[in-house]
Amino acid sequence: MIRKRMLCGLACAAALLCACAPRYPDDRLVSIVQKLKPSVVMLAMRLPPEHASDAYDVSFASGSVVASGAWGSDILTVRHAVRGAWHMFVTVGNTHKVPGKVIALDPVNDIALVRIARPNLPVVALGSSGELATQTGREVALMGYPIPDEIDGGLRTSLVTGTLSAVRKNALEMSLAVVPGESGGPVFLADTGEIVGVVEARIGEEPSIGFALPIDDAKRFLHRYDAAHGF
């Protein structure tokens, strides 16, 4: 009986310790994701058709809200997805669909800025990619909208985690999968939520290697745009 009581006491103590233990880092990532979600959007474009028999082509991408106010909101995304778009609609918060307009294209990097007439949206926190060369192996994550499918119409953000594999010239190499539709979405540090890159591409059919544009390149583009337009 004494042994049973001791075992019971130990079990209760263990349960109490678990309940009082600090949260694991994974809980921090969950909190970061919930904070980022309202600032990550889906872009759907109608493009000129590659074949004369088609009326138009459809392209999808993701983006991050980087500026917002009473005038509307600006979204950072990739140039290759939106260049030449005839029509564009941006889905905000998984439900609200509003027209979008390309207002700037970076002639050097694969970056674009899109504006929507949706005011006062939460914006992402842009970090720095300058010191990432010494931080290979650090955990990173990306968020975006995979191409719409038969499951839920593509109106749900997807989260992928991995590690920073290498910092190449004008590119971050990551050990994580990038699927169509996620290009343009944010790459962020899993422990802080700071944006360090813009999802760009993957290598051919290799699903486990992805690339992102360093956020410092995007910030220089944004600064040039702001300076030219008096912001």
Positions of PLM-derived features:
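A short, Trp-centered hydrophobic/proline-enriched beta-strand micro-motif
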Residues: 35-52, 140-142
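C-terminal cap/linker of serine protease catalytic domains
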Residues: 22-33, 121-123, 145-152, 195-231
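Bacterial N-terminal signal peptides that target proteins for export
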Residues: 1-10
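C-terminal motif of bacterial Sec signal peptides marking the signal peptidase cleavage site
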Residues: 17-19
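Conserved active-site neighborhood of the chymotrypsin/trypsin-like protease fold
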Residues: 24, 70-151, 171-173, 227-231
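A conserved glycine-rich beta-strand in the N-terminal activation segment of trypsin-fold
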Residues: 23-30, 46-75, 96-99, 184, ...
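Flexible, gly/ser-rich surface segments that form the specificity/activation loops bordering the active-site cleft
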Residues: 124-172, 178-182, 200-210
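Catalytic nucleophile loop of clan PA
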Residues: 64, 177-199
